[in-house]
Amino acid sequence: MKLRLAYAAALVLAAAVSIAPGLSGAKPKGAGAPAPPPATPPTDADFRTPDPKDLLVIETTKGKVLVELNDIAAPMAAERVRTLARQGVYNGRGFFRVIDNFMDQTGDPLDTGMGQSSLPNLQPEFTFKRGSDTPFALVFKSNGAEEGYVGSLPVVSQSMDLGLLTVDHRVDAWGTYCAGVLGIARADDPASGNSQFFLMRTNATSPDGGSHGLDKQYTAFGRVLAGQDVIDAIKTGEPVAQPQDKMLSVKVVADMPEASRPHVRVVDASSPWGRAAIIRAEAASNPVDFTVCDVKLPVEVK
């Protein structure tokens, strides 16, 4: 099943880091931020350690990619990809549809876009419910929306102020398609996703300069922590001519022998270093155009 292209100029609010309330998130977008002092190295207290069951190591013909799955935003999709990785379904799968300035598509047992696994199709997880107990790190508020991070996934959310008006005190939130975000590919039927997925390339804009309009149309279930340069180097084509680049193997880190596991730490967006990084990025950008995709937080892999 083929991922539909959405080249309409829909607004895609992109997220890449997070911040605790009370920093730049307290100001309306465009208000700007004073430049903080130059960055010092993050301390151990600024890092978080992802759960090994949520980490995938994808060995490709172009290099290694490290991905963090997100069970809060898309639990069914994350578990499906984890399951298929453990079954070996993704080993040897080609990147059969790769569009520069957009995405790399893979995960089809037929390597054509027309195949799927033997498991049932997935129900869409285009949005999820965010409550006061959701670990959402706020980046900023703009036009009644809040942008931030849930784990490493960039997220856009309705304002939690609206939670006062809902029965369960929760609001809608959704993963937003910054560079490195992973989404479940599907056909026109929203419930047609199965095994295929795509990874966003760095400059994910349409030929006319607009956004691809993927938010709330495709299930976002994870993000690249390391290896974005590999994603950007995958051979392009629609379809990709042979020989295609491939995923040689896809492994869940929790299943790997301890001696061969990568040890991963990510700067926590709500840490002092993370909050300062947000302010630095906002100060260095055009305040009107600033998005959380403009902020890069360190990932340490050993």
Where are these regions (language model features)?
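Cyclophilin-like peptidyl-prolyl cis-trans isomerases
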Residues: 21-302
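Bacterial N-terminal signal peptides
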Residues: 8-18
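Bacterial N-terminal signal peptides that target proteins for export
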Residues: 1-9
